[in-house]
Swiss-Prot record:
Keyword rRNA-binding belongs to the record: no
Higher taxonomy: Bacteria, Bacillati, Mycoplasmatota, Mollicutes, Acholeplasmatales
Residue intervals of the Carrier domain: 1-75
Pathway assigned to this chain's UniProt record: Lipid metabolism; fatty acid biosynthesis
Protein name: Acyl carrier protein
Residues the record lists as O-(pantetheine 4'-phosphoryl)serine modifications: S35
Source organism of the structure: Aster yellows witches'-broom phytoplasma (strain AYWB)
Gene from which the chain derives: acpP
Length: 76
């Protein structure tokens, strides 16, 4: 469920088909996400999942799986 929501957020933000986004998709290398795109994505994720993601944590997200794991771990 979290993965599906994150896929939707990414696809909407970057105008992509959700089928192109996997857990192993890398934000910078595969999606071309720059720092502004990453910040916007995190802000949407924070709203959607009602959590706070620090700037330091944001910098550690390299793949879709990283953010999915973080959200899974920090929501209950």
């Amino acid at each position: 469920m979290i993965f599906e929501k994150i896929k939707d957020l990414i696809a909407t933000q970057l105008s992509l088909d959700t089928s192109t986004i996997t857990l192993d998709t890398r934000f910078k290398e595969d999606l071309g996400l720059d720092s502004l795109d990453a910040l916007e994505l995190v802000m949407e994720a924070e709203k959607t999942f009602q959590i706070n993601i620090s700037d330091a944590t944001l910098q550690n997200f390299k793949t879709v799986q990283d953010i999915v794991f973080y959200i899974t771990k920090n929501t209950s």
